[in-house]
Amino acid sequence: MKSSVSWLFFSSIPLFSSLSIVAAEVTLDSSNNSYDGSNGTTFTVFSTTDAAAGTTYSLLSDVSFQNAGALGIPLASGCFLEAGGDLTFQGNQHALKFAFINAGSSAGTVASTSAADKNLLFNDFSRLSIISCPSLLLSPTGQCALKSVGNLSLTGNSQIIFTQNFSSDNGGVINTKNFLLSGTSQFASFSRNQAFTGKQGGVVYATGTITIENSPGIVSFSQNLAKGSGGALYSTDNCSITDNFQVIFDGNSAWEAAQAQGGAICCTTTDKTVTLTGNKNLSFTNNTALTYGGAISGLKVSISAGGPTLFQSNISGSSAGQGGGGAINIASAGELALSATSGDITFNNNQVTNGSTSTRNAINIIDTAKVTSIRAATGQSIYFYDPITNPGTAASTDTLNLNLADANSEIEYGGAIVFSGEKLSPTEKAIAANVTSTIRQPAVLARGDLVLRDGVTVTFKDLTQSPGSRILMDGGTTLSAKEANLSLNGLAVNLSSLDGTNKAALKTEAADKNISLSGTIALIDTEGSFYENHNLKSASTYPLLELTTAGANGTITLGALSTLTLQEPETHYGYQGNWQLSWANATSSKIGSINWTRTGYIPSPERKSNLPLNSLWGNFIDIRSINQLIETKSSGEPFERELWLSGIANFFYRDSMPTRHGFRHISGGYALGITATTPAEDQLTFAFCQLFARDRNHITGKNHGDTYGASLYFHHTEGLFDIANFLWGKATRAPWVLSEISQIIPLSFDAKFSYLHTDNHMKTYYTDNSIIKGSWRNDAFCADLGASLPFVISVPYLLKEVEPFVKVQYIYAHQQDFYERYAEGRAFNKSELINVEIPIGVTFERDSKSEKGTYDLTLMYILDAYRRNPKCQTSLIASDANWMAYGTNLARQGFSVRAANHFQVNPHMEIFGQFAFEVRSSSRNYNTNLGSKFCF
């Protein structure tokens, strides 16, 4: 259809091109040609009559024409008049503006061509504006701004603004034979224009075609009014809107005239088509029509979505009488084709008004009209939140193809065609007309899904299902054959919609017609939450399906009963069990029920939280960082008595594992301590700390922890020779090795004992938008024993000391049992973490050049000799379902790099800082601190 439209319009272009070679060219610029009649000057009309050439006006700068005929006598004709040939405006990327022009009752207030088949063209403007040319107040008998007996085109412009224009004739802005809008790079805005009483086309009236195509910008028609038909566009030939970036029809209206129809578009001429194809974004919203087609009234309508396509809140009808087609109306003997090719098509909140009553309606198919195809490409959907109506008595014999591809097409139509009542209020759902769709044609579902949701009824003349397709029904929905049979071989029922009373229904309405059901009945959990229903903790029975025929001789065939089986989800979370299908016979009907037997429970990832367990690893990270802080503080210049304060921060990240979620721990706070040196030069430190922690897993849980702790540190240094001599005892003969040991080499011992208490507050964010909270307490204890052997090295500006060391560190952390105080809450048993690690490493120390500070670098290998990973029994409060939850597991070996600095500001103050990084095969830990100590 697109090719025929383009040929029709452009058939005149070769003639125009040949004429343009010899056309008279007139240049326009601001200084010589711009006009503003507010100063009382007289406007001279630009008028030419050369039939052989036509005229081209070429802009040299921005030009504007304002208030011509507005303050006195109206102009005798429009501003630009071409009586002989084509009239062309070449913008050369300049702006052209017309505002408040009054040409009395002359057509073409701005510009016109009057010779047969001559063209009016506007090309390559940075901005083309036509405002109030004329306005209703200025000229109640005024006519359209642009008039062409031939073709009118707006091509290659950056911005177009046509607003507040008025016409007492057809076409609120434009009246032409063929209209073309193409290549708009930024936007084309047509707003608040109107065609007066009984006239058509609030913006454009075309006795030929309307073509809007290939615009990378936004094309919008908003709040335009035709007091006849076609609130924005009216065409007596084809109307084609194709391959644009975004097209918007909002708030347009066709009103007042008795048969006003097509709130946005009207094209009802015999054999003519409205084609909407390949648009990246297309929307019809809030348009209204007095009678038919709140958005579109057409004989033939073909929509192929190139992106999201929306029909929303359009209305047909009024308090004076019933309308037809809230969004789209197809006239008698017409056709409709819908294809969601590269985007979804959605009909929502469109309505038909009849007096004081309104009902939902997407599409109205009048009597002998038909739907040729409704199809959605794989991955796309067509959503009918409003029903389809098909009034009349003469059912079409032409087949409606659902998801059938064209011959030799590479597009696979395996998407979903959805009829749903989910956007209706409870009051609206109670009205049958709001949930009942009828298409009086035989239908074939070729591929993909036909989906019935939330209480809707969908009726075809008859319905046949091809292999590889699926019909998915909610409980409480009905699929009906109005005049013939139902033959289905791929039925699925949405478990999430079953409440123990409602069921999916298949029925025939005509007497003695048959229902055939074969293959499998798939049980689908579309919301993924059905198996969390606590009714499943015990044996349950759900009505599933009712098959009903009319008349005494209708038959219900279930195929070979052995092959009519349930197809359950292969894997799912929640209650585990088995379904069994059973049938009960009644008069002219069969009722199928499914019986549930429970076998177990598998928690979903959002229920299977391991945050309480992993909070113990957070305590593990924090208590080790306190020990590292005290070590860093103590390695500086010793004072006899000192008070110190330091900030501290930790970041820990554990990758996800196949069976356990990843984990992140962030904490920060401060530590305050006091250190004293004994007469024997031993150091004794006591510290208090407060930390604020944030934990998060990779699913839906977050935890906030408030931590308080205390630490005791003892450091003692003894000569290596003295220790060896003591260990040898009072032997009569000292071993030779004793004589090889220097009497000045020290051996350092340190011991640290730390305790942390944490108040945890966890939030779990479920996919149904509920939030469940839980609180508990953790306690952690650490004992750390170590020894080091420092060696002094006299290498100026390189190294001062090398100190190998070894430690043994024991950490115990305990999580209190608790439960979440919600109906869907969980109970967590207590758990504990025990870890014994042996760090082995070496510290390199050097003096700064200023001799007021030191730097040190520590390299450390860590071996976890023993570990008990946290785990606990978890259960649902509302059920006896329980499972074992496991905390994360760190690799047993790691490597750490730690850099520290000490700077003595004066004899009474020192600043110290540290950055540490520990890596294991699947985790990373960063620690930093910065503080000061004061001598007193």
Swiss-Prot record:
It is a peripheral membrane protein. Residues 1-23 form the signal peptide. Residues 636-936 form the Autotransporter domain. Keywords: Cell outer membrane, Cell wall, Membrane, Secreted, Signal, Transmembrane, Transmembrane beta strand. It comes from the Bacteria. The keyword Transmembrane applies. InterPro entries: Autotransporte_beta, Autotransporte_beta_dom_sf, Polymorphic_membr_middle, POMP_repeat. Its main location: secreted. GO terms for cellular component: cell outer membrane; extracellular region. It is found in: Secreted, Cell wall; Cell outer membrane. NCBIfam families: POMP_repeat. Belongs to the PMP outer membrane protein family. This is Probable outer membrane protein pmp7. It comes from Chlamydia pneumoniae. The lineage of its organism: Bacteria, Pseudomonadati, Chlamydiota, Chlamydiia, Chlamydiales.
